Each structure stands twice: as C-alpha cells, then as structure tokens.
A protein has these predicted regions:
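Alpha-helix boundary recognition
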Residues: 10-11, 57-58, 96
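Short, basic/aromatic recognition patches
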Residues: 1-15
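Short secondary-structure boundary/capping segments
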Residues: 7-8, 34, 54, 104-106, ...
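A generic local structural motif
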Residues: 2-5, 29-31, 49-51, 101
C-alpha cells in the first residue's frame, strides 16, 4: 500500500487505540479521537490528568491500532511529542478540521495535544484471500 492510499485509509477512521508505557513498565491503552496529517502523523488530544499524558512525556514511544471494520487495520509505532507555539496551532487546525466539535476543548483545564510521528506502519486486510499484509517504509 502506498502512502497516499494509507493516508486515505487512516483518515476514514476517527478513532484509534493508543498504547503507552507507565513508569512501572505496565502497558496502558486508551481509545482516542484522531486526525491524520499527510505525513501520516497522528494527532490526538488528552488531559494532563490522564494516565497516557505522563507516560508519553516520560516515554514518548507508543503504538496505535487504527481501523478494525472488516478486519482491515493499521498497526502504527511512533514517537509522541507535545507541540507548542506555531506548531501547536498548525496541528490544532488539522485536528479541528477532523473534530470541529472538539474546538471548545481548548478551554478545558489541562488539555494537551500530542503528535505521533511514525517509525513503523503495517497495513493488514484479513478479508482478502490470501490476506494482504504490507509494511510501509518510513524515512527518518
């Protein structure tokens, strides 16, 4: 699957499961609303009181699963950053284009935004015979 088709697949899905690692090494997962950049970055919001927030600040490596309808999924591993300044504004614009109803969340106490840059992506479609399983090359 090329990057354009992968982007189109990911954009069709509004939710993903993000997994992070706690301070004691325990994996923790949460369903989050997502937006996807053309560079295949995943943007999501959370609050600083969530478990994922301190996990990602201390250990930015994380993973996502996006999609699952019809056994089509993207497995995604990457590095999370909390953007600020002009970068934050740019990513918020992308996020709110996907989630306009979340724009009022900017006023929530402790709201935070993360951008996860991919380091490894695999697309799988188990509805096909034989299944389609493709890894996508990520350039550094």
């Amino acid at each position: 699957m090329d990057r354009i088709a992968l982007h189109a697949f990911m954009v069709r899905h509004r939710f993903g499961v993000v997994s992070s690692i706690s301070g004691d090494g325990t994996p923790q997962s949460a369903l989050v609303g997502i937006a996807i950049t053309p560079q295949l970055e995943i943007i999501f919001d959370t609050v600083r009181s969530s478990r994922k927030y301190p996990n990602l600040i201390a250990r930015p490596v994380c993973s996502f699963v996006v999609g699952w309808t019809g056994e089509q999924t993207v497995q995604f591993e990457g590095y999370a950053t909390e953007p600020n300044g002009p970068d934050l504004k740019r990513y918020q614009e992308i996020y709110f284009a996907a989630w306009p109803e979340c724009e009022p969340h900017m006023n929530w106490p402790g709201i935070a935004y993360f951008v996860v840059r991919p380091r490894w992506i695999r697309y799988s479609d188990y509805d096909q015979k034989p299944p389609i399983i493709e890894e996508v090359a990520i350039s550094s």
